[in-house]
Amino acid sequence: MSNSPVSLDSLFDKSLSAAQQPAWPDSSALERAVAELKAMPPLVFAGECDNLKARIAEAADGKAFWLQGGDCAETFAAATADSIRNRIKTILQMAAVLQYGASLPVIKVGRMAGQFAKPRSNDFEKRGEVTLPAYRGDAVNDLEFTESARTPDPNRLVKVYHTSSATLNLVRAFTQGGFADLRLVHEWNKGFVKDSRIGARYEAMANEIGRALDFMRSAGINPEEFKTVDFYSSHEALILEYEKALTRIDSRTGLPYDVSAHFVWIGERTRQLDGAHMDFAKKIKNPIGVKLGPKTTIEDALTMIKELNPDNEPGRLTFITRMGAGNVRSILPPLVEAVTKSGATVLWVCDPMHGNTYEAPSGYKTRRFDDVLDEVKGFFEVHQKLGTHPGGIHIELTGDDVTECVGGGEEISHDDLATRYETACDPRLNHTQSLELAFLVAEMLRDRK
């Protein structure tokens, strides 16, 4: 990896407008922060990004399944060893169940080590007579409702880098150091089935997985792949000063990569075809995703393919659909049909979270577990009818026992939300709800064969 200022400085079109960017009050402080980031070592390597691209190509071809999960918005305070371990543990547990249900390898991607910024509907928030800048994630400002806390501070971008580095260090230690051993993960899942009041429903599948592992052990099969896993990082490429400052020229190929994460996506609110985010995504060689909401037209989808993957490189482009449970069965089919007919190679992933948010009577933002599940069901039904591959799921989750989404086997109610509502932004599935979803999606994967 090299950082060649001449080629990088001319890489991106500076004349384009960028949506959802903070109004940094101190331009010289921003310049200093960007200069510091430009001098930092890469958080990931281009070769790792290429490996992920190859895995995504397999998933797009129906030979793997994508599991992406993590916080809605990471916070500096929650970047603790326990919190990171619990999130990884939850994703590994989900992956083991999905892998068995699908009889396919599962690509494990954390929505972590960089997901510190969020787009907002309004630039300002008003409480009583006081109006302050909206909270845009720890990358920009602080959740506390004071003028100093809400003033965008570019030094936070440097803190994002260091916190992401520490997170990735733990991720690598946990996934390569024996913590991710498939047999250990299965023991955790057995514990979930035994201890959870909804576990009985999933006991049969857990027992099947146990018998399969016992059979392999009896046959002397103990591959290294059981002991370690590849775990990739991802986040929304939102704050362009950060993403551009961490773009490097790969010394092997001379091509630019965003080395802040293996995979980045462009959000529903920033995917303007003539905008700076789309220009950024076009120029980097990482595998990239684009969020597609219910207003997406066929023309939008086909134009994005043409702009972002003109050579139809397998693994380059992932469409993450966020339609809402009530829309997915009507809006998704024409999009999938048109893209398939065009011959484009795209991985289709379902985000069943963002189209299903509503405000509870108490004022908390929440989501119904049944809506989340129904959108995934609709996603699978659409692909089943069209003969295409339901390539993966994108879930906002935590490894902790929070009470942010209602329903599920624990029957969390609107009245329970206040018990442990900890998210910095949108509501997340807790550990139990995440595992319950994995078992239910595993049943869908098994039934689709």
Regions found by a protein language model. Name each.
Residues A301-M304, P310, R316-W348, H354-T403:
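Non-transmembrane, aqueous-exposed alpha-helical and coiled segments at domain scale
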Residues G62-K63, W348-C350:
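Short coil-to-beta-strand
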Residues G407-G408:
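C-terminal structured domain segments
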Residues E74, A79-G324, R367, E375, ...:
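Active-site-facing alpha/beta catalytic cores
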Residues L67-C72, V109-M112, C350-M353, E396-T398:
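Short loop/turn segments at strand-loop or loop-helix junctions that form parts
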Residues S2-W66:
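N-terminal basic/disordered segments at the start of proteins
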Residues I56-A59, V97-Q99, F280-A281, V382-L386:
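A general structural signal for short secondary-structure junctions and capping/turn motifs
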Residues N51-K53, D274-H277, M304, P333-L335:
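Glycine-rich, charged/polar anion/phosphate-binding loops
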